[in-house]
From Swiss-Prot:
Cellular component GO terms held in the UniProt record: cytoplasm
Any one biological process term the GO annotation gives: regulation of cell shape
Protein name per UniProt: Cell cycle protein GpsB
Lineage per the UniProt record: Bacteria, Bacillati, Bacillota, Bacilli, Bacillales
InterPro entries in alphabetical order: Cell_cycle_GpsB (IPR011229), DivIVA_domain (IPR019933), DivIVA_fam (IPR007793)
Amino acid sequence: MISDKIKLTAKDILEKEFKTGMRGYQQEEVDKFLDMIIKDYEAFHKEFEQLKQQNARLKRELEEQKLVATQVPQQPVVQTPVAQPVYNNTNTDILKRLSNLEKAVFGSKLYE
């Protein structure tokens, strides 16, 4: 796990004492830099904890969804024959209209 690999905490960084030599560092500059590191470290830790919680929540939701999916019986989808009568009625209407149109256009020539 990642928390096993992390060696420092924000507190460790804050409390770290550095030795100074003859031509040592500027203490204020190092302190400001360490303060920035601490803030970033705390933000990363907070984000990490939120992501762990979100990950755990999503895993629970996934397991719940899997459980629900296995409990719902799979029923075959049955199509109702509603479309067929409509199709037959449409054909009948078209044939009647065609017959009426032929009578109107050709008149009595068809029946002679």
